[in-house]
């Protein structure tokens, strides 16, 4: 009796007889045996690559402990050498620098707060052509200068200084310089109605030689690759402490005469801010270990004095406002002496303040003008967080180079 094969067995037998070889090329997994490699080996290889890249970056960072523009002698400057904590603000380590930032923050104001409604009447009816010429050119100088100060802060100082407390101040200073520039531009826009004259003033660095000369002096320090941070710090203290001083005084001269209330009020706010910026430069200078020689500091200041005196007595004579040129020279020397003392030098001019109307004007804002907020212009509560013991205040005072700060009354 024959055994009958079931249908299922027939199918199974047929499958076994099929030729499973394909004419196509077979995939060869055996060559690399990748599917059989333990996962840990791949992970170890990846970790090794990451470690190698990290070590390479670490070596590169070690080779750049200083910013490219810093000098070998600045390698031990805590303010300038690489600070791994620079991305985090707290805990505060430089309390006097932090207090300076909070003081600047409390003094915030905007261009919209300046009332220019009465200025146009004075401009059109109470000023002569010489006075208009002088004021318009002073405003043109200021409008350009604030941009130059910001150029230095953005391109050099903010990147070079490695401590977050100082970077906070510089960040706020940049904002305030923008507000100053906006204010001066707004003043020009308000007083000068002729479009071509406006363009001439807005482009003062290119169109007005005496302003270009002052701008070139400041710009040279920004681009100077051979000077140290300390030298440039002194130079820009001179820009804000000396280059602006005579112009501020000339506008306060208008206040004494009861002219241009909007201009003179903005001048008071801006002069206070610039005094604080100069104070801050002197404070940072006191934290440097390697400072320029007293002779070099004196040379920078004397050079700035010469340029400022020439600017306000020859190129754009203050006599146009009815001010005495010799007294203006003396006033610039008086301001320069105070800056020299703040930087740890001795006075060289020993000039007294020749302008009685400046006696009650403070670059720190301690005024008695109750009708405006300039005397106690502070945002509520901002300064409360900076209250320290008298000992801390004394330390900050000493580190400013003595008992002088630019917020003292003239």
Curated annotation (Swiss-Prot):
The keyword Iron applies. It catalyses: a 2'-deoxyribonucleoside 5'-diphosphate + [thioredoxin]-disulfide + H2O = a ribonucleoside 5'-diphosphate + [thioredoxin]-dithiol. Binds 2 iron ions per subunit. Residues 1-43, 55-78 are annotated as: Disordered. One of its GO terms (biological process) is deoxyribonucleotide biosynthetic process. The active site is at 184. Its EC number is 1.17.4.1. Fe cation 1 binds at residues 146, 177, 180. It is an enzyme of class 1 (oxidoreductase). Its cofactor is Fe cation. GO terms for molecular function: metal ion binding; ribonucleoside-diphosphate reductase activity, thioredoxin disulfide as acceptor. Gene3D superfamilies: Ribonucleotide Reductase, subunit A (1.10.620.20). It comes from the Eukaryota. Residues 23-43, 55-65 have a biased composition (Basic and acidic residues). InterPro entries: Ferritin-like_SF, RNR-like, RNR_small, RNR_small_AS, RNR_small_fam. Fe cation 2 binds at residues 177, 240, 274, 277. Provides the precursors necessary for DNA synthesis. Catalyzes the biosynthesis of deoxyribonucleotides from the corresponding ribonucleotides. Belongs to the ribonucleoside diphosphate reductase small chain family. Heterodimer of a large and a small subunit. This is Ribonucleoside-diphosphate reductase small chain. It comes from Neurospora crassa (strain ATCC 24698 / 74-OR23-1A / CBS 708.71 / DSM 1257 / FGSC 987). The lineage of its organism: Eukaryota, Fungi, Dikarya, Ascomycota, Pezizomycotina.
């Amino acid at each position: 009796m024959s055994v009958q094969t079931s249908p299922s067995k027939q199918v199974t037998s047929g499958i076994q007889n099929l030729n499973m070889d394909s004419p196509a090329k077979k995939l060869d997994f055996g060559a690399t045996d990748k599917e059989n490699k333990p996962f840990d080996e791949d992970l170890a290889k990846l970790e090794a690559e990451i470690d190698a890249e990290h070590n390479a970056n670490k070596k590169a960072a070690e080779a750049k402990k200083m910013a490219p523009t810093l000098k070998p002698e600045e390698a031990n400057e805590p303010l300038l050498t690489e600070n791994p904590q620079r991305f985090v603000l707290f805990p505060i380590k430089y309390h006097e620098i932090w207090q300076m930032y909070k003081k600047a923050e409390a003094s915030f104001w905007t261009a919209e707060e300046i009332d220019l409604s009465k200025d146009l009447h004075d401009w059109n009816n109470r000023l002569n052509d010489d006075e208009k010429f002088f004021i318009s050119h002073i405003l043109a100088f200021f409008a350009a200068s604030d941009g130059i100060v910001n150029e230095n802060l953005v391109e050099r100082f903010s990147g070079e200084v490695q401590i977050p407390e100082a970077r906070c101040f510089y960040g706020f200073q940049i904002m305030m310089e923008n507000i100053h520039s906006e204010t001066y531009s707004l003043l020009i826009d308000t007083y000068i109605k002729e479009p071509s004259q406006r363009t001439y003033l807005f482009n003062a660095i290119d169109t007005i030689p005496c302003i270009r000369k002052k701008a070139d002096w400041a710009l040279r320090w920004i681009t100077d690759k051979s000077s140290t941070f300390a030298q440039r710090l002194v130079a820009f203290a001179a820009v804000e402490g000396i280059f602006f001083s005579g112009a501020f005084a000339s506008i306060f001269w208008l206040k004494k005469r009861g002219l241009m209330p909007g201009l003179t009020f903005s001048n008071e706010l801006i002069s206070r801010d610039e005094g604080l910026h100069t104070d801050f430069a002197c404070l940072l200078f006191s934290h440097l270990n390697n400072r320029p020689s007293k002779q070099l500091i004196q040379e920078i200041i004397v050079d700035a004095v010469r340029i400022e005196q020439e600017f306000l007595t020859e190129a754009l004579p203050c006599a146009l406002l009815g001010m005495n040129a010799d007294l203006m020279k003396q006033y610039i020397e008086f301001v320069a002496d105070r800056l020299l003392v703040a930087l740890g030098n001795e006075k060289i001019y020993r000039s007294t303040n020749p302008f009685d109307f400046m006696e009650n004007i403070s670059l720190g804002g301690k005024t008695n003008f109750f009708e405006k907020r300039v005397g106690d212009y502070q945002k509520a509560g901002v300064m409360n967080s900076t209250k320290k013991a008298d000992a801390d205040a004394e330390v900050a005072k000493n580190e400013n180079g003595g008992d002088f700060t630019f917020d003292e009354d003239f």
